[in-house]
Amino acid sequence: MLLLLVSVVAALALAAPAPRTQKKRMQVNQAPNVVLVASDSFDGRLTFQPGSQVVKLPFINFMRAHGTTFLNAYTNSPICCPSRAAMWSGLFTHLTESWNNFKGLDPNYTTWMDIMEKHGYQTQKFGKVDYTSGHHSISNRVEAWTRDVAFLLRQEGRPIINLIPDKNRRRVMTKDWQNTDKAIEWLRQVNYTKPFVLYLGLNLPHPYPSPSSGENFGSSTFHTSLYWLEKVAYDAIKIPKWLTLSQMHPVDFYSSYTKNCTGKFTENEIKNIRAFYYAMCAETDAMLGEIILALHKLDLLQKTIVIYTSDHGEMAMEHRQFYKMSMYEASVHVPLLMMGPGIKANLQVPSVVSLVDIYPTMLDIAGIALPPNLSGYSLLTLLSNASANEQAFKFHRPPWILSEFHGCNANASTYMLRTGQWKYIAYADGASVQPQLFDLSLDPDELTNIATEFPEITYSLDQKLRSIVNYPKVSASVHQYNKEQFIMWKQSVGQNYSNVIAHLRWHQDWQRDPRKYENAIQHWLTAHSSPLASSPTQSTSGSQPTLPQSTSG
């Protein structure tokens, strides 16, 4: 009975009139509260059919029923820090020069939360933020800086699973649960006479660290308990199709090799990795649920806009990879759901959107004028009354999104233009590495590159991409940045830099022939700068390269 009452109350509250219009800006004390929950590594395709059938996600389903789901939401860079830099700045990656997990925004950069605070909002952040420069391990930095070197070294542990055989163990990711508890306690203490904006960053469902003798543990363990694994429908798990190693795009082969995924995997191994990942997503959903339940108990749900998203997705063995760092759907397609006053219920939006849209949307919710030259666009015109505003939405924003990647585990800067049925992926200088073109309406698994089959479409999309970003120039800048940063680091550690590298994540491969790899680095350092992808010299195996119940426990 309680659940029915809660569902009815929430449904009525969430169908309330829009909190503002374009014609009249609200006073801050009339503005709604905002809660943004951002997880890590969550595949956005799990938030709608058919992906949502594989695992029970009751609170995401609640948001779907009482709010708006964006069916085609994308990260602007499929790796943690650059993606979050885009979300917090509202700018594309090449504009903030957030090239890798070490290089993000300046710590003093003015974010949307800073602006909302200046306009009277109470603000608070808990958990993983990760949008500023200077973080992550030495391994992560050196791997990104040396991706242009002509060698091939495994940088990650082979993906594995680890099960806690306890049907009652709900709190597996302890740190995330602790941050969720802190966020809820803050909600209990906040001054309700003023609007607030709360951010909760979760590390789940990012894979866990794996045992390693290197400087930094690789994060290749999919870890959960029997409690969460029972939320997964094993029969619904799809085993992804793989191209042979010789058929793979050269950048994909490099990524698969550095991620230690070119070896043999049984179908059972692949299915278990995917099942454990989905179980980790279920635990993530439960933390989102604790926030929603707390808002309800505090009589704040009908006054608060709740947003859920993620920095990027998770490959989970699609295209013979785990992690992200790729432009395939599993890596770049993120969840984006919103519910609250003025947001249409049970709406699915097919338009392409991306994380740079968070910045202008947050300010628009608060009735704050948007700064000029943002890369993103507010989503509110579409959310308040989709049928009336969809055409205006399309008129005011372009029908494409941009994603780019410049970090480790890929040996070329990568650029994705997503528009309509098409996904176009360009690399490096646009000439040295073959592009990719996928028709997602016919090839949702992205197994057939039709770039050469449809040269006119490929050319048109490439020209559009170049009108958005001069990607050959950006690639050259990243190449030069990588070289300069590596030289500075090499000088800082002295003549024994090879011994330092020998104890990073790629230590096992490096120690087999350190002289060979030192020579490759020296050749790279003395060669003329070029954004071209490297040609690995190491031989490899294979050819080429109602509100649900709480689950907090």
From Swiss-Prot:
UniProt record similarity statement: Belongs to the sulfatase family.
Biased composition, class Low complexity, residue ranges: 534-553
Catalyzed reaction equations: an aryl sulfate + H2O = a phenol + sulfate + H(+); Hydrolysis of the 2-sulfate groups of the 2-O-sulfo-D-glucuronate residues of chondroitin sulfate, heparin and heparitin sulfate
The EC number(s) this enzyme carries: 3.1.6.1, 3.1.6.18
PANTHER family linked to this entry: ARYLSULFATASE K
Pfam families reported in the protein's UniProt record: Sulfatase
Protein keywords: Calcium, Glycoprotein, Hydrolase, Lysosome, Metal-binding, Secreted, Signal
Alphabetized GO MF terms: arylsulfatase activity; glucuronate-2-sulfatase activity; metal ion binding
InterPro entries assigned: Alkaline_phosphatase_core_sf, ARSK, GAG-degrading_sulfatase, Sulfatase_N
Residues of the active site: C80 (nucleophile)
Protein name as annotated: Arylsulfatase K
Cofactor: Ca(2+)
Signal peptide, first to last residue: 1-16
Modified residues (3-oxoalanine (Cys)): C80
Positions annotated to bind substrate: K128, H249
Cofactor annotation comment: Binds 1 Ca(2+) ion per subunit.
Species name: Mus musculus (Mouse)
Residues carrying sugar: N108, N191, N260, N373, N411, N496
Changes after translation: The conversion to 3-oxoalanine (also known as C-formylglycine, FGly), of a serine or cysteine residue in prokaryotes and of a cysteine residue in eukaryotes, is critical for catalytic activity. The 75-kDa precursor undergoes proteolytic processing to yield a 23 kDa form.
Predominant localisation class: secreted
GO cellular component terms listed in the entry, alphabetical order: extracellular region; lysosome
